[in-house]
């Protein structure tokens, strides 16, 4: 299989844009599909002047989700500040020398704080998240969808959930600390229940339909190996 990250970089840089304007690449896919890892690989292939931004930072804070009655739908489209996300991409495209990026902590399970992002000439900004194409398809130079079988996605999610719970044994501030008194079997059962009642629903109802908006579909096999690349 052709080096997928390098192919994504080549495709993105071939897209029309104003001279010197940053290239914005969107990467989406289900929870646990490996978006962050793939985005990091694309950034490495692109070299310097490349940054990765997660849409998780554009989630509403937990307190606001609670107030709106949306905490059970965290990660669904309505739980994101899409206007703020779109303004961010506009600022990147505008040639601004610096933009602010809101941050998210998976350990704390909440947003918090911002960090500055310095944009250099011919920069590439990779925006990754479950809602990237749904929110930004018309603003991207290149939209990428990471595809995988549902049974593989569930297995990857459970593995990640178990790992986060194990790490929480030594981190009292971690959101996952609350599960550490449970047995591994109980944690795995909880993870599968969460996948099927929340993440699978989000995938089928909101994420998978955005596959049609992608310029490129990268299909993964059971071991996160890339088995196909479809360029549209």
Please give the residue ranges for each predicted region.
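NTP-dependent small-molecule kinase module
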Residues: 1-16, 159-162, 187-232
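Short hydrophobic/aromatic beta-strand immediately N-terminal to the Walker A/P-loop
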Residues: 24-26
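Walker A (P-loop) phosphate-binding loop of P-loop NTPases
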Residues: 32
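Conserved lysine of the Walker
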Residues: 35
